Every structure is written in C-alpha cells, then in structure tokens.
C-alpha cells in the first residue's frame, strides 16, 4: 500500500514537471511512498505511431525508484488496470498479481546493452538522477512505439527467449545440443519419449540430461559429458516432446497456465491433452518406469532473427496431473479408460505452470565469455609435468576450450606444493597427474582429460602408443633430461613441441617451440643457455622442511600464475602458426613483462 507524501525530494518533484512538459506524457498524480520504501508516480504515455491490438494509443505506467545498496534503481511498470496487459520482447513477464501494488511485473528493458557489464561509461545512460529519469522515460516512449509497430526485435538481432513466470531461481537442468544435432531432433517433431538425468555432484539444485529414450523405453540418444559427470547414477525422471516452434503467446508471452500451454500446442497442430493421455498410459504399462516429474519441450532455435534454426533448445517444467495405477475417484471405476480421461484434465486447467530453468552446456555455449581459436581447441594436447606451471597451464587451456588433454607425471603431490599449485589439500598424497586430471574433468561439462602416472618416456608400449595420439606436446618439467627423452622418443609423426620453463625466482620464462617429427633438443638447450637469465643462488634456496636440507625452487604463486598466462598465450600462438620459435620473457621490478624474441 502506498501513501502520498507531503515532503517529496526536489529531484522527484522536478521529474513530475519533466513528465508534464513532454507532449507525449502527462500526470495529475502525486508521488507516493510504499511501506518498502519505493517511490512511485503514475503517469500516461502516448504513442506517436498508430496503435496496435496489443498497444493502445494511451497507456498508464508507474515510474518507480528505490534504493538498492549504493545505487538508486529506476524502473517503469504497467498499471494494473489501465496499462498494457500483453508481454512483448525485451520485457519481463507482464502479470497482475494479488498484491496491493498498483503496477504489474512487466517492466520493459530500457537499459543500454553495455550497462549489463556494470560499466555506465560504456553505455549512454547519464549519471545524475534527474538525467537518468529523463533518459529512461525517453527510452520508454521509443519502446512503446516500437512495440506498436512490432519492431522491438528485427532481422539480425540476437534471439531472446521470453521471460518465464515463477521460474525456479536456481534449479537448473543442463543439456548439450550442438548444431549437428538439429536434423535428428527435427525428425522427431510431434513425437515424445523418456529422458534420464543425473544430479551434478556437489552442486546445488543442478541436474543434467544423460539419455533420451523413445516412448517404448528404447535408447535413441546419449549425451556426452566429462568423466567426472558420468560417475553419477541415471534416473529416468523426465518426458521429452519436440515442437515445431517455440511455445509462446502473441506477442511474446511464455505460457503461465496449463491451458495456455495447450493453446500453444494447438497452434502447432498438436494436442497436449493427447500427449498427457499417452504418457499416462505408457507409464502405467511400464512397471519399472517411475512417474516422471519433468516435461521437456524441445524446439528449433535460431541464433539471430531471420536466420535458419541453428540447434534444438529445451524448456523444462514440472509435470503434474498424471494418474497412476492406484488412482481412484468416487463414483468412477478405476479403469485404464477412466484414468486416460483424467490425464487429459491437467492440460486444460488454469493451474500455474512451474517452469524450471534450463541451460545449453554445449562447448560453444559454455565459453561465450572467452575461448581459444579453433586451431588449438581441435587439438589433443599432452602436458608433461603436472607441477605448479604445468597444472596452471592445463587449467587455463581447459577453460578456454582445449578439452582433450593428457597429463603425465610420476610424482605425488606434497603439502608444500599447494602454495603455488592448481590443486588443493584433498589431493595431497595422490599422484599429481591423476589428481590434476580429476580436477580438470570437474571444471566444465565437456572436459576430457586422462592421466599417465609415470615418468617420461613410459615403459609400457600401450602408454607409448597413447602418447603418440596427441597433436601438441608441452614440456613443463624444467628438466634437461626430459628434453633429451623427448628427442629420443619415436613419435611416428610430426608434432608441435613446446617447452616452457621458469628461471630462478621465476624472474623469467623460457619458451621454445618446433613443429617436427622429433624434438630438437640441441637447438632448444642452446637457446635456453644463451638467454640472459638470473644465476641460480643456493643461498636464496628454501629448505623443504626442518630437519633436512633439500632445496626447493623459490617462486610465489602470483609469479607462476603470470608465467602460466604468458605460456598459455604462447601455446595458442604457436599452434596457430607452427614453426621453430624461441622467446625469453622477463618480469620487470614493477610486474610488467618484456619479451626478447630470437630470430631464426
């Protein structure tokens, strides 16, 4: 409940004047302050273009401001009685709830796209409060005109799914759909079946889809996930159905009730009541099939408006209303025919849908925040040496999309290693390679790392043949003996060899690369020795622990992280343009890095 306040801040009073001075806006109302400290002002906005069936000439809105930590939020909401009732693109779901607030939930998106990054200087929105209010109101006028003309989303724009009402805040169902998968699912339009899922170990409220079966329970598709994710048990707890298009009500409203979803099915020439009847009959007939709790709706989705569909996308909602073999109703016989009739009732009800959030965990979707070029993402990479530098480079490569990795190391992880290693205390006492691979396979769903818990070269012929399958061989041992072994090993084909080693106190980084059938150890060693790197000073060495004099390499975690970043970029460059390359990187006292290239 809001109350009119006699003493209104000067900036808000100025905003009222600003509205009445605009020929397309007007208000006779006063500012009101709600119990939850939200200022609101009711006003009318007028179109400058012809009206449409969803956008009238005049619509009533509420300008709402409130304090959110150190910022003042400014939003505009439709009035419950005289505002727009439809939901458009670039608008939150527009619903009139039973609260005492006078406005609905459907505030349009008026922000400039760059502001989502939290940097106002990237956008056009000003900083002063009154200027921000004026800017938002002018954006609203542009928005209602575009909505009336159906121009909120135009050809070439990125496709945006509608806002789903009452969607779970963090329960997430992950799936993986690539571009190549679309023809398979397009052939299943109008069909349905069962699906299994597994809980993501250690995560909160997160599932991922494992297998798809037809409606007879026969396996038709398996989703590939990381070895870590495949350890969990599968539960067949979902039903899938493929639609020819996104289920949406004009102009851009996600269905809120089962009846609205039935209407979307009917628009596609399908019947949701028939689907429920068929699902119920199959579940009751399959004695080992537990009652599914989720309904997955798949449909082809394009990346940009006007493009051809690129891949299948899945929506999820809680499945309810199906009868089981024990379902009875007073006055009715508990027959299969009656239960099929009862199953058809839920899709025609006004009961709200409980939408569940879904995400596409396909490789190209996971790394939209940043990934390596395809040149290296397509390569199989072997890292020899899972110490501080090797572990951090392996993690960097995994996160940017180099998912097929082999890690080789014979050593066990010591507690002392943890001060500058990617691993944690839970890995102490384990083989470094095996523990690092376990860590890598937990990073992202498409990870595919394997370990070789041995020294190089391995004695086993099976292991030797496995190593020969890798395209890029990265040495992170800092051991001259390993370089000689790299040269002596019969790789059978041309490889991209890379050797990275930190200098004393991690003041510099040696970086050598070659694309040949064997590692050119003489050239690499001579390059390393010729570089102006700091001399080893045993007086600066640290002891491993009290009671023994076993010197350890002095370097801080931030130094190792720096060289891991530089080394990762070097690896990416070399793979994109193979050849003999040697570079020496030196860290300056202020933390900057200088590169000393060496010509061939």
Curated annotation (Swiss-Prot):
Inducers of expression: Part of a CBASS operon consisting of cap4-cdnD-cap2-cap3.
Superkingdom per UniProt: Bacteria
Active site: 109 (for e2-like domain), 548 (for e1-like domain)
Gene3D superfamilies (alphabetical): NAD(P)-binding Rossmann-like Domain
Residues at the site labelled Adenylated: 420
Coiled-coil ranges (or none): none
InterPro entries reported in the protein's UniProt record: ThiF/MoeB/HesA (IPR045886), ThiF_NAD_FAD-bd (IPR000594), Ubiquitin-activating_enz (IPR035985)
Ranges where the record places region E2-like domain: 1-158
Phenotype when changing residue 548 to A: Less efficient conjugation with CdnD. No conjugation with CdnD, proteins still co-immunoprecipitate
Alphabetical UniProt keywords: Antiviral defense, Isopeptide bond, Transferase
UniProt-annotated stretches for the region Linker domain: 159-373
Region (Adenylation plus E1-like domain): 375-600
Family, per entry: In the C-terminal section; belongs to the HesA/MoeB/ThiF family.
Recorded domain comment: Has an N-terminal E2-like domain, a linker and a C-terminal adenylation plus E1-like domain, dimerizes via the E1-like domain.
Subunit structure: Crystallizes as a Cap2 homodimer bound on each side by a CdnD monomer.
Protein name per the record: ATP-dependent ubiquitin transferase-like protein Cap2
Gene it is expressed from: cap2
